């Protein structure tokens, strides 16, 4: 599993996805990210993600993003866990 620090992320690398719930994301936004709650992402990844693009997943503490990164990586997606 690929892991990078948030400080090393740059927008040209791929899409930064904040997988926290919408309330947490709105109260404490992560600069440069789009919010897709992890449950929604896991239920709809086939229609929401493109296997030819890079995605960087981030959450509050790193546990959920690590878990979701592993799952999506298993299904062949180019995903990286982002830690703060």
Please annotate each region the language model reported.
Residues 26-27, 43, 66-70:
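Alpha-helical elements of the RecA-like P-loop NTPase motor core of helicases
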Residues 48-84:
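Catalytic cysteine-centered active loop of the rhodanese-like fold, especially the PTP/DSP P-loop
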């Amino acid at each position: 599993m690929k892991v990078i620090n948030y400080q090393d992320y740059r927008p040209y690398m791929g899409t930064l996805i904040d997988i926290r719930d919408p309330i947490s994301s709105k109260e404490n936004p992560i600069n440069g990210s789009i919010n897709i709650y992890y449950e929604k992402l896991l239920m709809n990844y086939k229609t929401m993600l493109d296997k030819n693009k890079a995605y960087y997943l981030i959450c509050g503490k790193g546990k959920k993003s690590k878990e979701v990164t592993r799952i999506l990586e298993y299904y062949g997606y180019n995903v990286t866990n982002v830690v703060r």
